[in-house]
Amino acid sequence: MGLQLALLLAGIVALSDSARGPPRIADKVIHRQSVRLGRTIKLLCPVEGDPPPLTMWMKDGRTIHSGWTRFRILQQGLKIKEVESEDAGTYICKATNGFGSTNVNYTLIVIDDTSSGKNSQTPEGSNGEYEDHSGKQWAQPRFTQPAKMRRRVIARPVGSSIRLKCVASGNPRPDITWLKDNKPLMPHEIGENKKKKWTLNLKNLKPEDSGKYTCRVFNKVGEINATYKVEVIQRTRSKPILTGTHPVNTTVDYGGTTSFQCKVRSDVKPVIQWLKRVEYGTESKYNSTIDVGGQKFVVLPTGEVWSRPDGSYLNKLMITRAKEEDAGMYICLGANTMGYSFRSAFLTVLPDPKPPSAPVPPSSVSSLPWPVIIGIPAGAVFIFGTILLWLCQTKKKPCSPPAAAPVHRPQPRDRICVSQVPDKDCISSINYEEYVAQQQHLLSQGPALAPAMASKMYPKIYTDIHTHTHSHVEGKVHQHQHIQYQC
């Protein structure tokens, strides 16, 4: 039972860990879609992820935004109303989060019932060719460079130029006419060179040149057409503007993951850069810094800038495995040729719930090994005992007698002559002045009491007292008392 519970917990942990990662496709996708002209179609983007991904749609490499009036980006996918022939092409849903991105691809085919009705009277082969009663081969028109026609929505600034191509072939050789907003263009607007009639050149664009340009290619067998949408925009006259409330102050757990967002509105695609303020005293950690508003900042790596349907641009800064040094002020900087704007936010990183173990203080000995606990006091006692023993042995050595020979002077019979006087260093228990006074008192007691009193008064100094009595030639008797001192 315990083993099964452990395996169950391990599986739950593994599932929770695996949930965080790049976006993934959550449902089956039918990549080839078809729709009839004038109808409505919805292309789904069934992706999921943790954290939830951001999605954007592209058609033939061009980002779909709010200017595409018949296109609407929903939470579930892309909705196209009143489908036109030029809506055919390749669509991509790109989903991205902080761990990566994934794409969902579609190929949209637009079915034109009216064209098929016109051609229904003509016996066609599978490739648009047929043979008449005389045996001649005929072929309806077809575009020979479809790869150069994928980009159907084109934006250009005022004063620039653009070329719209509709190169086609057929048998008999087809003709081509150009229309703007369903009105034929004049010959001088197209050009008289037949070799260039398949390409429409628009030079020195003006705002009034915006519109839908259609090429109609036809022969006796059939007809094809293609439409381009041209947007002529005024050159930018203002610096970028940061919209919304982002970036906002954020708090993250130690080791966790968080992000800052930055939404910038600009007439042209701006440069979005993230900066982090360099805290005082940490300048040496960075190779280069920049000054913004009188403060030093370091430039951070920046990911892809996304174009949003509302015409704004979005960028995200991901912070993974947050540490204490990640805390501080962050700046989102949006710039174009006219200037820049920025906005700041602060990141707070909560303390590590499991900080590294601190060094054990000297007062705490519970975590020290037992050999150390026993060895240190034992070593100290051994050293102290050795020093104490050495001092005791040193103090037991006898003091050297004075170098000069004792001088014998005649003394009265009742006086005591002290032949040896201890050194000051040998008298450790009394001071020298007390010793002299006691010595005089000792001698005044007479020879009979002196030895006994001396041994009582100085038990550690007087170790041997003896008396010598001898007579000289002159008949005088001298008595000497010898006292042996020992420290």
UniProtKB/Swiss-Prot annotation:
Database matches in InterPro entries: FGFRL (IPR052615), Ig-like_dom (IPR007110), Ig-like_dom_sf (IPR036179), Ig-like_fold (IPR013783), Ig_I-set (IPR013098), Ig_sub (IPR003599), Ig_sub2 (IPR003598)
Ig-like C2-type domain mapped to chain residues: 23-109, 141-231, 240-348
Residue intervals annotated with topology Cytoplasmic: 393-487
Keywords, comma-separated and alphabetical: Cell membrane, Disulfide bond, Glycoprotein, Heparin-binding, Immunoglobulin domain, Membrane, Receptor, Repeat, Signal, Transmembrane, Transmembrane helix
GO cellular component labels: plasma membrane
Protein location: Cell membrane
Glycosylation sites noted in the Swiss-Prot or TrEMBL record: 105, 225, 249, 287
Complex formation: Interacts with heparin and FGF2.
Role played: Has a negative effect on cell proliferation.
Topology within the bilayer: Single-pass type I membrane protein
Species per Swiss-Prot/TrEMBL record: Gallus gallus
Biological classification of the source: Eukaryota, Metazoa, Chordata, Craniata, Vertebrata
Coiled-coil ranges from the UniProt annotation: none
Transmembrane intervals: 372-392
Keyword set includes Hydrolase: no
SS bond list: 45-93, 166-215, 262-332
PANTHER family linked to this entry: FIBROBLAST GROWTH FACTOR RECEPTOR, FIBROBLAST GROWTH FACTOR RECEPTOR-LIKE 1
UniProt-recorded name of the protein: Fibroblast growth factor receptor-like 1
GO molecular function, one term: heparin binding
Secretion signal span: 1-18
